[in-house]
Amino acid sequence: MNSYGYVLSGGERRRTEIARSLALDPRFMLLDEPFAGIDPIAVEEIMKIVTKLKKRNLGVLITDHNVHETLTITDRSYLLFEGRILKSGSAESLANDPEARRLYLGESFKLDRYDL
């Protein structure tokens, strides 16, 4: 590919960032807002990439406000509220927690698992 970084789409940038990080053969990765500002197809592709990284026993820490997508692919999650950890646990336990729903997720929040 002979394109400059500034001409890549948001999803292409995310995939490039992940590929560049993998070149260093890390044991752990931080993905900051990987689902922000990209189209739904790119979101699904990034979710699949993260799922594959987990299967390779690579630790992945995700910070993102797109809670639905993040909870869908995480094994353990932390909800922050007013700068503190409000709740931690599995996606299912957070999605069903009354306090997490009242203060952060919203009463109508539904957690759907994808077959990635």
Task: Annotate each language-model stretch with its function.
Residues 29-33:
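Catalytic Walker B motif of ABC-type/P-loop ATPase nucleotide-binding domains
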Residues 44-56:
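Helical segment within the ABC ATPase nucleotide-binding domain
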Residues 4-8, 12:
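Conserved ABC ATPase signature
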Residues 88-89:
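ABC ATPase "signature
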Residues 25:
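Conserved catalytic motifs of ABC-family nucleotide-binding domains
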